[in-house]
Amino acid sequence: MWPSSEGHLYREQKRLVGLGWATVEDEPAGRRTRKRYTITPRGREALSEWLATEPDGPRFEIEGVLRLFYADRAGTADLTASMEATAESARAMLAEMVGIVDDYLADGGPLTMLESGTGGPGEERLEYNGRPQYPERLHVVALAIDAITRLLAELDEFFTATAEETRGWAGTTDPAHTPETRRRLEAISARYSKPPASMPAR
């Protein structure tokens, strides 16, 4: 959703605290402690201002796609292995997201809180799996998770199919790929050149 290194996230958290947009406190986490960040009223105001701005366009950071661009410099075995690894990563990320959804659906979880009208604004925050919950936000969280899981499922499907296809290639520079290349490009054009259903053709 927003790729970034752990170091960058840590610096951003400190910056938010420095701006007065969040507070931080240590809390027990087993035998150790962890930092819990809480948004402040000033932070909520800044968040509302940001949400009123025009969003940036989508950005992709999928190394498997980059490797496809330069696949003619690789052997078929390396290419296929890269495709399989990318599919496996997408599959693992999808499974992790589904696990989160299952937690939301579990008895006593956020959806139960939402449906029973408990743990919302103005009430004591209820915890689930050791974390405070915000059931009143679940409708927008569900939309975000829907987008993420669909994208991950598409990535898994595409890279799995691509690995199966490239596994049968004699080489990555074989002229025999030419007819399939035409079929693929024509299929892309046919699939996406027509106007969306909400936009009638002229």
What are these language model-derived features?
Residues 1, 86-89, 151:
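Histidine kinase transmitter module recognition
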Residues 1-60:
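Basic helix-turn-helix/winged-helix DNA-binding cores
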Residues 13, 87, 94, 149, ...:
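Short amphipathic alpha-helical/adjacent loop interface patches that line ligand
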Residues 17, 44, 91-98, 102, ...:
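Structural signal for well-ordered, non-membrane alpha-helices
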Residues 21, 27, 73, 102, ...:
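Short, flexible helix-adjacent loops and helix caps
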Residues 38, 69, 144:
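Conserved beta-strand segments that form the floor/walls of ligand-binding pockets within enzyme
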Residues 49-99:
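Amphipathic alpha-helical dimerization/coiled-coil segments
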Residues 83, 100-202:
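Charged, low-complexity intrinsically disordered regulatory/assembly segments
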